[in-house]
């Protein structure tokens, strides 16, 4: 018989830097999960990713065991890293903070492809371009 899922916890944690302090500790502790076991597993799986923020979905089962799936970094984080900026525009319609090329958009779309709801790379590029527009980043040819 399959284990019955009790809760799903979604977190965004820097790669290789999960520790029991907030937000990880309280989120897992309220469901009775072994926090250190998660931290060790997450850090081992993501240590090669550098300093990127990694979304993770943790499934907690009724017997207090858990499994987790790491996703690709958020598109906004990848865009800001590619454009060498720390923060997006506070008013993206009128204030542009950076420019990014179509080639960089394609690279980011290829990285994000497993997590995007798109069938081909062109559709994925349109999604990433929309995210760039929302952050105040101009896409140039």
Curated annotation (Swiss-Prot):
Keywords: Methylation, Ribonucleoprotein, Ribosomal protein, RNA-binding, rRNA-binding
Zinc keyword on record: no
Pfam families found in the cross-reference section: Ribosomal_L11, Ribosomal_L11_N
One biological process term in Gene Ontology: translation
Ribonucleoprotein keyword on record: yes
A GO molecular function held by the record: large ribosomal subunit rRNA binding
InterPro entries hit by this protein: Ribosomal_uL11 (IPR000911), Ribosomal_uL11_bac-typ (IPR006519), Ribosomal_uL11_C (IPR020783), Ribosomal_uL11_C_sf (IPR036769), Ribosomal_uL11_N (IPR020784), Ribosomal_uL11_N_sf (IPR036796)
GO cellular component assignments: cytosolic large ribosomal subunit
Post-translational modification: One or more lysine residues are methylated.
Cited function: Forms part of the ribosomal stalk which helps the ribosome interact with GTP-bound translation factors.
Subunit-level organization: Part of the ribosomal stalk of the 50S ribosomal subunit. Interacts with L10 and the large rRNA to form the base of the stalk. L10 forms an elongated spine to which L12 dimers bind in a sequential fashion forming a multimeric L10(L12)X complex.
Family label: Belongs to the universal ribosomal protein uL11 family.
Family matches, as NCBIfam families: L11_bact
Protein name: Large ribosomal subunit protein uL11
Source species taxonomy: Bacteria, Pseudomonadati, Thermodesulfobacteriota, Desulfobulbia, Desulfobulbales
């Amino acid at each position: 018989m399959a284990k019955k899922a009790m809760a799903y916890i979604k977190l965004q944690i820097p790669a290789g830097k999960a520790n029991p302090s907030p937000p990880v500790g309280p989120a897992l502790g309220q469901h009775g999960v072994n926090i250190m076991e998660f931290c060790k597993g997450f850090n081992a799986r993501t240590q090669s990713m550098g300093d990127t923020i990694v979304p993770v979905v943790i499934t907690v089962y009724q017997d207090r065991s858990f499994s987790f799936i790491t996703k690709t970094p958020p598109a906004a984080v990848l865009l800001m890293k590619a454009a060498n900026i720390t923060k997006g525009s506070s008013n993206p319609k009128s204030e542009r903070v950076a420019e990014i090329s179509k080639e960089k958009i394609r690279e980011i779309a290829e990285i994000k492809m497993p997590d995007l709801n798109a069938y081909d790379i062109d559709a994925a590029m349109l999604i990433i371009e929309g995210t760039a527009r929302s952050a105040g980043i101009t896409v140039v040819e």
